[in-house]
Regions:
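Glycine-rich phosphate/pyrophosphate-binding beta-alpha loops
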Residues: 98, 160-164, 333, 339-342
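Structural alpha-helical scaffold elements that stabilize or flank donor/cofactor-binding regions
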Residues: 148-149, 217-218, 247
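Short, glycine/acidic-enriched loop or turn micro-motifs at the edges of active sites
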Residues: 20, 24, 68, 192, ...
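Intrinsically disordered, low-complexity terminal tails and inter-domain linkers enriched
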Residues: 7, 28-30, 130, 136-145, ...
Length: 360
């Protein structure tokens, strides 16, 4: 019998956005495609990670704000069915749950194109999607709801999107302060999405100076920092995990994912097994890709699952143990790529183990 992740205090708290990814037809435009060619999938990076952890059997909580609408209710049902702790979820009766338009290439790669219903919220409160429920996360509600969850937690998993509006940025700061007071480490997946900051932004734009200034304090509080390769270039001018760690005062563990090119990481001087400061690298698994949406979130869920099971991985674990954890995380991401959407294809522990056995 599988254990219920919600039956114990969460080891990971995932804080941030829950939304719908509206996937356009492969090679088509989600803004103009007819409804029958669109594929709506529940998503949002922290919600994806929470669902992935629960699927693997790690006790986890999701903290976010949902619109009191059909999408929000569907999300609450899904999270509850997965066994995610929802005791700190907030509900918004004024703002809708966000729908993100996702353009897919014929090869399954995705590009974020803005938001459905953007005209309804444009011009209200400063940044792209500032009137959606996820951007109105309330610090006052967190002050009461979060401490009981932190009592048994090892990790607070966050992204940068809450910084895009004043209310959710304040709530994020509150969560970070509470986590620090409880000795809970921060896992930051930057998840840079320009259109969440400015609906008119180029989806491929790098962070500007003002945004970098706002991101820097967040980067400096991470114990574990996960970046896509293009995010690493945009934020640090390098894809080298060692160089990235050295540029931050706390010297975090750093993982840089690069799609089909694989993963590079640095968990300390012993990561490579050479005794010197150089990153370790693992090639990606070769799998048929249906949709890459959520692959990075599946990877992070797999890695946090391993870190909860073996807390010393980022400290003094031998290189082969660190590599095994990264390989497990890569398998989680590869399995997500073989289905549609970020959450539905997430694997159970037995499926990951079977995949690894089949890919020695």
């Amino acid at each position: 019998m599988e254990r219920d992740p919600a039956a114990a205090l969460p080891q990971v708290i995932c804080l941030g956005e829950a939304l719908v990814d509206r996937l356009g037809p492969p090679g088509g435009d989600p803004t103009t495609a007819p409804p029958e060619q669109l594929d709506d999938r529940l998503g949002g990076a922290p919600a994806n990670v929470a669902c992935g952890l629960a699927r693997l059997g790690t006790p986890v909580a999701f903290v976010g704000r949902l619109g009191r609408d059909a999408i929000g209710e569907a999300f609450a049902r899904l999270l509850a069915e997965r066994g995610v702790n929802l005791s700190a979820v907030q509900w918004d009766g004024e703002r809708p749950t966000r729908i993100v338009l996702v353009r897919r290439s014929a090869a399954g790669e995705r590009r974020f194109e803005g938001f459905a219903g953007e005209a309804l919220v444009a011009g209200h409160g400063g940044g792209g999607g500032a009137r959606f429920a996820d951007q109105a996360l309330a610090a006052r509600e967190l002050e009461m709801a979060l401490p009981p969850l932190l009592a048994g937690a090892r990790w607070l998993q966050i992204g940068s999107i809450p910084l895009a509006s004043a209310a959710s940025a304040q709530a994020l700061e509150q969560a970070l302060a509470l986590a620090q007071g409880c000795g809970v480490a921060v896992a930051l997946d930057v998840n840079w999405r320009p259109t969440f900051w400015d609906a008119a932004a180029d989806p491929d734009a790098a962070p500007g100076h003002v945004t970098l200034t706002r991101l820097r304090p967040l980067l400096e509080r991470a114990r574990l920092l996960k970046l896509a390769a293009e995010e690493a270039e945009g934020l640090f001018g390098s894809r080298d995990p060692v160089a990235i760690a050295a540029s931050l005062p706390q010297r975090p563990s750093v993982v840089v994912t690069d799609g089909a090119a694989g993963v590079a990481w640095w968990f300390g001087a012993g990561s490579s097994g050479s005794g010197v400061a150089c990153p370790a690298v693992l090639p990606a698994f070769e799998v048929p890709v249906v949709d890459s949406t959520g692959a990075g979130d599946g990877f992070l869920a797999g890695l946090l699952h391993c870190l909860c099971a073996e807390p010393a991985l980022l400290a003094d674990a031998p290189p082969w143990r660190q590599r095994a954890a990264i390989r497990f995380a890569c398998a989680c991401g590869a399995l997500v790529c073989q289905g549609s959407g970020a959450i539905d294809p997430q694997p159970r522990l037995a499926a990951v183990e079977a995949f690894l056995d089949a890919h020695p």
